[in-house]
């Protein structure tokens, strides 16, 4: 995949070359999207809109730390949607990981989560965030146990992941109508990089075959159900819907 690769660390240790080789990235000086190594983290920038700033994954500080400490925990809609109850903490495959926010929330309340991400740039951002998270004295211990990244396409991986998870979580990219600053910023940068998930409808059936309990699909409240398969089971929040579908139980 072609993208502009930039190193702002001042180091000469070849880290950028290692990064490019690991994720299959090719430097393109004229690409409007840039993956930048800064002294703090790896970030994605839209070069023709510098005011949008950089997008990076941070499980330790910022909004994620605030959500972990002061958010709803088990009371969050995503936790309710996957079925967390009492001692039941399902094993989850997040097949459209993105920046890993929902996966992190589930891991922080005790679920083991395998994140799948097919875009190499997004996977590199996630890996960078995980590396810093794993090294953190506060959250590193449980984060290593519960949150894992697998760089694959969900369309093929969902048929051969083992062991089977109890829940598959899907949050495919869908054009946002909201004008909130964060959504606007992230979506503009993300849509420029990966575009909408035009093949997302193809995820529902393999997800239902893989999950032993349920599939949860996060949708904007104005979006039709994934693959136009309606379900009476949903958790509705302001702006979003978590559609719930039955999985395929394990056979003896």
UniProtKB/Swiss-Prot annotation:
Pfam families: SAM_MT
Keyword Phosphoprotein: no
Record-linked SUPFAM superfamilies: S-adenosyl-L-methionine-dependent methyltransferases
This enzyme's EC code(s): 2.1.1.242
Catalytic activity line of the entry: guanosine(1516) in 16S rRNA + S-adenosyl-L-methionine = N(2)-methylguanosine(1516) in 16S rRNA + S-adenosyl-L-homocysteine + H(+)
Family as reported in the entry's similarity comment: Belongs to the methyltransferase superfamily. RsmJ family.
Name under which the protein is recorded: Ribosomal RNA small subunit methyltransferase J
